[in-house]
């Protein structure tokens, strides 16, 4: 009997202890949350910056927007309401002032630079950092090795390759139009992405992906194209510490498998290009030779070739689609572009990379299209140096996340007159837009980490658009009137851009 009484006593004690422990843990958690909210609102070093209270208390609303793909419109709304700098999370500020752009991303003295958010920029599948994710001296070293592939000399030598795939695009579209009796619309984003993938495949690996010939996504390209969202979700999950490992377990294994397969296929293509020893002006021919006698190691080459394909294809195709959409929605601008292009050339053969550089309205149209629809609309997060920094005349403590919100800056009335109106004239000296702060439009960023292939991208877009407007009359279908109403996960989640094409009669 005494034994049973003892067991019951310990059992009650154990249950009471567990209950007391749960109550204590609950109280401590509640106390911590209340204290954290109080601290973030009233005591945090960023307490003086404008922004809604619900964003200053927790990072969860910010991450919810990231996961749902609604970060871009929400940031635009915040800046419209609160001004050029907004506190978007307890320890993060968003800017739309171009002075902040220069401070955050521009050239700075050693030790004073703004580091990339380590949670957002992870190494490639093989664990090696690319030009996108490397820091400091390592980044400078990688950039020096890649830069010759994007020099003016290289660009001049690559123009025949660019011309070839532009010719192929126009020929395939012409064949499709001639074969279609009912002027069936085509998805121009698909045709643009097939073109840029074929081009970048040829430049990166010495062989195209043959998307244009097949008029479809090949298996490899489909994997790469779908990998963007995978990369976005994996990177976002890493910002949820200490729950990041749990969240990553919830990401379907198929998404990670696609990422791994893309990398392994890239490795095979790099190996095949190196083994061929071909003498042609593609990216690898310059990178393999090295810079100042220092060549890129093979693991580094694998990591960077994957990035070159991802960044070099999607961004240009997005830009082309966005510009096409804006142009077809604005008939007067379309008319001016068509008149400039069709009056500048007597034959289609005259439309080459060098000749399109001399068309001012075409250049303005591209600049305005990229302002309205930047391929990567979200900000690029950075960490302030340990000693802190002055941004737009205000002190920001060290270890603070800061970013220049690209799309919000491009659409801000503080930076542009009629910011939501597509007006190429703003880039041509029209006095109506004299107060525009044009340096606020930076679709390819600035500074030592700006897009290394921006000159190639601009040339591609000008050439392809000139050829399209020379060859076809184009009309947007009614269902695509709101095509630019899109979510984004690093890049835009694009819908089909359905356009009716008809051959120009000459």
From Swiss-Prot:
The keyword Metal-binding applies. Pathway: Secondary metabolite biosynthesis; terpenoid biosynthesis. It comes from Stereocaulon alpinum. GO terms for molecular function: heme binding; iron ion binding; monooxygenase activity; oxidoreductase activity, acting on paired donors, with incorporation or reduction of molecular oxygen. Heme binds at residue 451. Keywords: Heme, Iron, Membrane, Metal-binding, Monooxygenase, Oxidoreductase, Transmembrane, Transmembrane helix. This is Cytochrome P450 monooxygenase atr2. The lineage of its organism: Eukaryota, Fungi, Dikarya, Ascomycota, Pezizomycotina. It catalyses: 4-O-demethylbarbatate + reduced [NADPH--hemoprotein reductase] + O2 = proatranorin II + oxidized [NADPH--hemoprotein reductase] + H2O + H(+); proatranorin II + reduced [NADPH--hemoprotein reductase] + O2 = proatranorin III + oxidized [NADPH--hemoprotein reductase] + 2 H2O + H(+); proatranorin I + reduced [NADPH--hemoprotein reductase] + O2 = proatranorin IV + oxidized [NADPH--hemoprotein reductase] + H2O + H(+); proatranorin IV + reduced [NADPH--hemoprotein reductase] + O2 = atranorin + oxidized [NADPH--hemoprotein reductase] + 2 H2O + H(+). One of its GO terms (cellular component) is membrane.
């Amino acid at each position: 009997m005494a034994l049973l009484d003892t067991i019951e006593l310990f059992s009650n004690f154990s249950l009471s202890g567990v209950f007391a422990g749960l109550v204590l843990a609950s109280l401590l958690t509640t106390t911590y949350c209340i204290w954290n909210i109080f601290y973030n609102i009233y005591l945090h070093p960023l307490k003086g910056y404008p922004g809604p209270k619900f964003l200053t208390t927790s990072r969860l609303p910010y991450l919810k927007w990231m996961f749902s793909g609604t970060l871009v419109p929400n940031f635009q709304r915040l800046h419209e309401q609160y001004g050029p700098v907004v506190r978007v999370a307890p320890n993060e500020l968003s800017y739309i002032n171009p002075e902040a752009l220069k401070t955050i991303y521009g050239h700075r003295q050693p030790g004073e630079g703004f580091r990339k958010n380590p949670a957002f920029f992870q190494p490639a599948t093989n664990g090696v950092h690319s030009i996108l994710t490397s820091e400091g001296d390592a980044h400078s070293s990688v950039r020096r090795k890649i830069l010759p592939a994007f020099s003016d000399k290289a660009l001049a030598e690559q123009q025949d390759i660019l011309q070839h795939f532009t010719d192929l695009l126009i020929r395939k579209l012409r064949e499709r139009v001639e074969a279609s009796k009912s002027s069936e619309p085509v998805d121009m984003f698909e045709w643009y992405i097939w073109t840029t993938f074929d081009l970048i495949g040829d430049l990166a690996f010495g062989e195209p992906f043959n998307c244009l010939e097949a008029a479809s996504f090949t298996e490899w390209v489909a994997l790469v194209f779908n990998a963007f969202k995978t990369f976005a979700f994996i990177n976002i999950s890493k910002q949820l510490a200490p729950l990041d490992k749990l969240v990553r377990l919830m990401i379907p294994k198929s998404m990670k498998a696609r990422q791994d397969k893309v990398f392994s296929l890239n490795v095979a293509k790099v190996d095949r290009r190196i083994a061929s020893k071909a003498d042609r002006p593609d990216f690898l021919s310059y990178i393999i030779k090295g810079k100042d006698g220092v060549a890129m190691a093979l693991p580094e080459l694998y990591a960077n070739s994957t990035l070159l394909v991802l960044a070099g294809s999607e961004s240009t195709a997005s830009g082309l689609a966005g510009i096409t959409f804006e142009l077809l929605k604005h008939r007067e601008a379309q008319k001016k572009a068509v008149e400039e292009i069709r009056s500048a050339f007597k034959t289609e053969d005259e439309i080459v990379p060098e000749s399109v550089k001399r068309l001012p309205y075409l250049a303005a149209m591209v600049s305005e299209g990229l302002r309205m629809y930047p391929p990567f609309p979200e900000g690029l997060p950075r960490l302030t140096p340990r000693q802190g920094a002055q941004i737009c005349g205000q002190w920001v403590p060290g270890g603070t996340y800061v970013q220049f919100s690209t799309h919000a800056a491009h659409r801000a009335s503080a930076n542009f007159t009629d910011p939501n109106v597509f007006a190429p004239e703003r880039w041509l000296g029209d006095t109506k837009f004299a107060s525009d702060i044009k340096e606020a439009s930076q679709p390819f960023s600035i500074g030592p980490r700006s897009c290394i292939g921006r000159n190639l991208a601009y040339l591609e877009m000008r050439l392809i658009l000139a050829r399209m407007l020379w060859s076809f009359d184009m009309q947007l279908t009614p269902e695509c009137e709101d095509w630019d109403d899109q979510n984004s996960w690093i890049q835009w989640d694009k819908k089909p851009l359905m356009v009716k094409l008809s051959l120009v009669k000459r």
